[in-house]
């Protein structure tokens, strides 16, 4: 009975060591595909437009539509393949979040309104103090006593 129990312990220990060795090598091989520890510190140049309505760098979508109507879409024949190379250093990031022009305009107006409310609200101040100077004034004790001797009080 003791021999079976000790055989079970030996087999369990060997199985545990084999599994540990397998998973530790898998973790080492997996590290090659991960980013480095300082990858987040590099600023990647972002590629693409944030708002498709701002085609051809025009601010108004209707102007962009007129421009596209006049000039049409560029085709592959318009570009010389020798001049065109894919830049490997550029990383295409998808634009995420509120990228609508109306939302940006609303957020800008809301921020402007908050600034104006702070300037004209009840807690607004000019930031200047026109009263007497506050705080400790450095006065020489001897000079103060000499100055007080020359002053007289009139009753």
Curated annotation (Swiss-Prot):
InterPro entries: Periviscerokinin (IPR013231). Residues 1-26 form the signal peptide. The modification Leucine amide is found at residue 134. Residues 27-33, 50-85, 99-117, 138-155 form a propeptide. GO terms for molecular function: myostimulatory hormone activity; neuropeptide hormone activity. GO terms for cellular component: extracellular region. Keywords: Amidation, Cleavage on pair of basic residues, Neuropeptide, Secreted, Signal. It is found in: Secreted. CAP-1 and CAP-2, but not CAP-3 are ligands for the Capa receptor. CAP-1 and CAP-2 are probably components of the signal transduction pathway that leads to Malpighian tubule fluid secretion via the second messenger nitric oxide. Belongs to the pyrokinin family. This is Cardio acceleratory peptide 2b.
């Amino acid at each position: 009975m003791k021999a079976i129990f000790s055989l079970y312990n030996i087999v369990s220990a060997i199985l545990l060591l084999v599994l540990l060795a397998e998973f530790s090598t898998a973790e080492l091989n997996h590290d090659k595909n991960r980013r480095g520890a300082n990858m987040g510190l590099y600023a990647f140049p972002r590629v693409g437009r944030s708002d498709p309505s701002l085609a051809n760098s025009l601010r108004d979508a209707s102007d962009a539509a007129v421009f596209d109507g006049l000039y049409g879409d560029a085709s592959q024949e318009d570009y010389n393949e020798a001049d065109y190379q894919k830049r490997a250093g550029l990383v295409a990031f998808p634009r995420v979040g509120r990228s609508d022009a109306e939302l940006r305009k609303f957020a800008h107006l809301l921020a402007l309104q908050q600034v104006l409310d702070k300037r004209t609200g009840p807690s607004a101040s000019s930031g200047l103090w026109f009263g007497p100077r506050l705080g400790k004034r450095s006065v020489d004790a001897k000079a103060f006593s000499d100055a007080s001797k020359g002053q007289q009080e009139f009753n």
